[in-house]
Amino acid sequence: MAKTKYGERHRKGLWSPEEDEKLRSFILSYGHSCWTTVPIKAGLQRNGKSCRLRWINYLRPGLKRDMISAEEEETILTFHSSLGNKWSQIAKFLPGRTDNEIKNYWHSHLKKKWLKSQSLQDAKSISPPSSSSSSLVACGKRNPETLISNHVFSFQRLLENKSSSPSQESNGNNSHQCSSAPEIPRLFFSEWLSSSYPHTDYSSEFTDSKHSQAPNVEETLSAYEEMGDVDQFHYNEMMINNSNWTLNDIVFGSKCKKQEHHIYREASDCNSSAEFFSPSTTT
């Protein structure tokens, strides 16, 4: 028993059948406009909150006393996924069931089932790659032609790799030899030209090799035109830029070329003079 502010004592605990009958008969006769006055008028030593919960959850007409069916479970699971733990709103879609009853049934039965379904959905969301791979294997089993073509293609690729491996090794060895060989110094065109033609003064046209300016190509080209060998000018310039020749090769090669050119001119002059003094011309 608990005392109120007016000194009255209120009962707590289980409701007796006599108390249930008093509350039911009073509410059916007079209604429940104000729950604080209901226990006083009904002659009950209970507070208004206890009377309200007893009426809503146990005594009001239309309540279902049997167990919750499978259809009701599906309804609870469906609306719980969208509404969450709002039991009073879920109870509106289940006539005859109270929010307290739905909440108790959820925590005692449906929560475990819901957790299992969530774990299965997570497993299904992770498993599609394996299912796709299994489908590919199944397609390969159903279509043996694709398997044969795949094997032939892989065999061809293996042969190509084997045939290309010696060339790759030789290329690797050549590159290693080239990297280990001493690097040929790069020649500037002014250095080569001064060494090839020492009688010509190019000091006014060229500066230091590290800070060299562009040579006067027109004068150099005109010198080669006098020799009648413009192609040799372009060929020497290309070989110098590519650094494929050493200094000795370029210098001696150009000197030999120059000597051959002079010898050829002297020979042609001799031939022309011999023809001029031939007996046929004198007579």
From Swiss-Prot:
Induction annotation: By hormones or elicitors treatment. By exposure to abiotic stress.
Signal peptide range: none
One Gene Ontology CC term in the entry: nuclear speck
Compartments it resides in: Nucleus speckle
Main subcellular location: nucleus
Any one GO molecular-function label of the UniProt entry: DNA-binding transcription factor activity
Quaternary structure, from the entry: Binds to FHY1 and FHL. Interacts with COP1.
Protein task: Transcription factor that promotes photomorphogenesis in the light by participating in the transmission of phytochrome A (phyA) signals to downstream responses. Probably acts by activating expression of light-induced genes. In darkness, its degradation prevents the activation of light-induced genes.
Protein name (Swiss-Prot/TrEMBL): Transcription factor LAF1
Organism: Arabidopsis thaliana
UniProt gene name: LAF1
